[in-house]
């Protein structure tokens, strides 16, 4: 089984990696947005500890990028990276994304009806649920997600 490993640390690395990873899946255009959102969530919420409430405020004030750049320089965050593993099994393509944060309550966000339409945050995981993955699972801590698609 071929296994490929990657790391990302900055937002500008995420799009290119999501495009590259998606090419290994049967329907790249469908899974690419899900991969992108998972990588972005791992970086901003996991590694940089930007909570949902703060993200909403930063987006409304057009200061999200500024805050991400500021946190990337802070001692407690500057050495963090997101680990990505792509496994090409005989019958499935699988991606495993792990951040170095404290994790989150993924059950809340993956349960239909727990998100309201007027919220600016939580949309990424909602998109992931509809991104063409056959299976999505999180570790107990909530800092690792595994998504797979049958070949």
Predicted regions and their residues:
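Bergerat-fold GHKL ATPase/HATPase_c domain
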Residues: 1-40, 44-61, 65-74, 85-87
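Flexible, glycine-/charge-rich segments associated with ATP-binding catalytic modules
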Residues: 1-8, 92-96, 102-105, 109, ...
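Broad hydrophobic/π-residue packing in well-ordered secondary structure
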Residues: 20, 79, 87, 137-139
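Residue-level signal for the start and early helices of compact helical domains
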Residues: 22, 39, 73, 95, ...
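Glycine-rich/acidic phosphate-handling loop/turn and adjacent ATP-lid/helix
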Residues: 53-122
